[in-house]
């Protein structure tokens, strides 16, 4: 163990006082309303007995909790990494901030597995894909991530640097238990879910490719959505966990060497800020690009649409903008083709006739 003092690393916290707070403000402005819409749309799907809505609901709650912690962190970075709200609030907001990263990843994994079962094995796992099962799985995800990331609640997380700034959830060099916890976060909290998601979406692509009844346009839509998810997951979370792993490995090898910490400090904070973009990507990829959820959002915004656009009789163009069509969602159709597959997650009807139809159409 390194016995150097807590301010032995000459960290200049003034270097990153612009980018993180700017990005956090952007995420709050965009992420809060879109996740509120996602929350409402997911709730509607849950009421329709759609198990995908359960995961979307929990994902939106996780993102909103994350966004709720951003204002004090904006203040923290604007004051050059100086926490002024006391030790208990540091523990609380830091715990929520870091834990929700992995809760979000956990529910993205749940959605990936659910979509894989729906597309690749629509009949074999039909009984597993139920609202009650999704609720139990969601409770397990919350319990595991909260328990696995609760250690900082029992340690002092305020540390002063050479500028008399009070760091929150940051110590340079880090402590032994933090380095070990970081390894768990990297391999269990990030790498394992990412490999699982990659496996699921490769299975989805194989199932779509081998099914001759799937239309070409629908195949392209599913592939774009799948590949875009992997890309955004890598963009939002991979840089942070790569740097986190590097910091932990270097510390465990040379606990008293601050050179690496000093050189990578700004990059570490930038990568941490990039994880917040997941709160903007989630509702676009998994809710607003969803046929059922998109129609619910459009219908829910209809009163506001009429109120703010009373002088504009033609509402068609506005309705198209509300759907937030992205490169991952093709233009909206009047009704899904009976020969096409979808990642919509809509629950079919009960009974023998619906099962025969599902077997013939191979739909979600």
From Swiss-Prot:
Keywords assigned by UniProt, alphabetized: Cell membrane, Disulfide bond, G-protein coupled receptor, Glycoprotein, Membrane, Receptor, Transducer, Transmembrane, Transmembrane helix
Quick one: a GO cellular component term? plasma membrane
The question of whether Heme is a record keyword is answered with no
Cytoplasmic-side positions: 46-49, 122-129, 211-214, 290-364
The positions annotated as site (Proton sensing) read 155, 165, 269
Result of mutating residue 51 to A? Decreased proton-induced G-protein coupled receptor activity
User: What is the regulation of this protein's activity?
Assistant: Activated by a network of residues that connects an extracellular-facing cavity to Glu-145, a conserved charged residue buried in the transmembrane core of the receptor. Protonation likely drives conformational changes in extracellular loop 2 (ECL2), which stabilizes movement of transmembrane 3 (TM3) and a series of rearrangements that connect the extracellular-facing cavity to Glu-145, a residue only conserved in proton-sensing G-protein coupled receptors.
Q: Which residue positions does the secretion signal occupy?
A: none
Q: Which InterPro entries match?
A: GPCR_Rhodpsn (IPR000276), GPCR_Rhodpsn_7TM (IPR017452), GPR4_orph (IPR002276)
Q: Where is this site: Required for activation?
A: 145
Molecular-function GO term, any one: G protein-coupled receptor activity
> Which residues lie within the region annotated Extracellular loop 2 (ECL2)?
157-172
Location, primary (coarse class): membrane
Q: Name one Pfam family in it.
A: 7tm_1
Annotated membrane-spanning segments are 9-45, 50-80, 86-121, 130-156, 173-210, 215-250, 261-289
The glycosylation sites are: 3, 164
Subcellular localization is given as: Cell membrane
Instruction: Write out the domain note.
Output: A multitude of proton-sensing residues, which include extracellular histidine residues or triad of buried acidic residues, contribute to activation of the G-protein coupled receptor activity and pH sensitivity.
Q: What does this protein do?
A: Proton-sensing G-protein coupled receptor activated by extracellular pH, which is required to monitor pH changes and generate adaptive reactions. Ligand binding causes a conformation change that triggers signaling via guanine nucleotide-binding proteins (G proteins) and modulates the activity of downstream effectors, such as adenylate cyclase.
Identify this protein by name.
G-protein coupled receptor 4
Source organism (scientific name): Callorhinchus milii (Ghost shark)
